[in-house]
A protein has these predicted regions:
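Active-site donor-binding loop signature of nucleotide-sugar glycosyltransferases
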Residues: 37, 48, 81, 91, ...
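Flexible, glycine-rich phosphate/dinucleotide-binding loops
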Residues: 41, 85, 105
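Acidic/polar loop patches that form or flank catalytic/metal-binding clefts of enzymes
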Residues: 33-35, 128-133
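Hydrophobic/aromatic beta-strand patches that form the interior of the parallel beta-sheet core
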Residues: 15, 33, 58, 77, ...
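Catalytic beta-strand/loop cores that center a nucleophilic Ser/Cys/Thr
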Residues: 53-94, 132
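A glycine-centered loop/beta-turn motif at secondary-structure junctions
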Residues: 88-124, 128-131
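Cysteine-nucleophile active-site neighborhood
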Residues: 1-56, 64, 109-118, 122
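Active-site glycine-centered loops adjacent to acidic/histidine catalytic or metal-binding residues
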Residues: 18, 61, 102
Length: 134
């Protein structure tokens, strides 16, 4: 449930993929909307905002996170080139990142591997203790 996930995000790092991306946005006050045409297949170009690099991504979803009234605690990290929808986000103060595509599908040999590397670096920054009940 959303409350349980919200509680987890208060004390644990998280990497949201696809629906997880949308859920993280909702937890922090973001909104989603139904796409006119869903993103399907392994050829969706996504731009990493910081580097300007464009990656081919594998996607399969019919909703997207809205950039309107975007949560103040989150930064947009990736945008879909085809329709300028939010394809990645990062929490400003917590080790929480998410992407709207399937980096584990890797259309190329190492195209999106850096997402996992970035998350590993985030969680290595401190020692994490899982509270009883999670």
């Amino acid at each position: 449930n959303i409350k349980g996930l919200r509680d987890c995000l208060e004390s644990l790092p998280a990497l949201g993929i696809c629906l997880g991306h949308q859920i993280i946005a909702h937890i922090y006050g973001g909104e989603t909307f139904k796409l006119l045409f869903g993103h399907r297949g392994g050829n969706q170009p996504v731009k990493e905002i910081e580097s300007g690099r464009v990656y081919p991504t594998s996607q399969n979803h019919g909703y997207a996170v809205s950039d309107k009234n975007f949560p103040k605690d989150l930064n947009i990290t990736h945008m879909n080139i085809n329709d300028n929808t939010v394809s990645g986000l990062k929490h400003k103060n917590k080790p929480i990142i998410s992407i709207q595509y399937h980096s584990e599908a890797c259309p190329g040999p190492v195209d999106s591997e850096y997402i996992f590397d970035n998350f590993i670096e985030l969680i290595k920054e401190k020692e994490w203790i899982v509270k009883e009940g999670f």
